[in-house]
Amino acid sequence: MLSILYFFLGTSLGSFIGLICDRFPEKSIIFPRSHCNQCGHPLRFFEMIPILSQLFLRFKCRLCQSSIPYRYLFLELFCGGILLLYFYNYLDFGRTYLLFFSLCLTIFDLKNKSYPLLIWILGTLPLLCLGNHYLTFSLGISLAVLSYIKRLNIGEGDFLYLASVSLIFPFSKILIAIELACSFGLMYFLVRKNPNETVAFVPF
């Protein structure tokens, strides 16, 4: 029973992350209340139940019948799965939080090829309390500043994200993550349809 509660909490967090990524920074994440993006219909409580409401409504708005993107369902399922892993002790609290934070930045990066600095600051503050690799964190911040000044090929946001990750993971694992990200990024670079498209690094 408790595992179901954790899963439902995770799906709710996933729904909230989706709302943040849809609205911020152009709109308030508090007002107006959740609504259909097409017709503006304010959602009733039974239309905001994660996963179940989408299945019940068959991925369509109750009023205008416009389609609800499947990405919201996948996001809620993924976040529910993360909290289940935490519940069964496959993840500690720090890595669980980092996964949610990374997911939020990933969505922003995929949409805009960047993410709001305020989101990074607010998301990193708890990691400063949870982590202890402050030297590596300082190195990441320094590289971000250098990237901003010199306009390097790797954006400052990528270095800021690596700085956040370094608070939870040691430097050796950060290097492995960079190697894997560069490999996957290169593969995507080679097969992409638009040769002038900027590649978002955080998702990798």
Where are these regions (language model features)?
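A membrane-topology feature that recognizes alpha-helical transmembrane segments
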Residues: 1-204
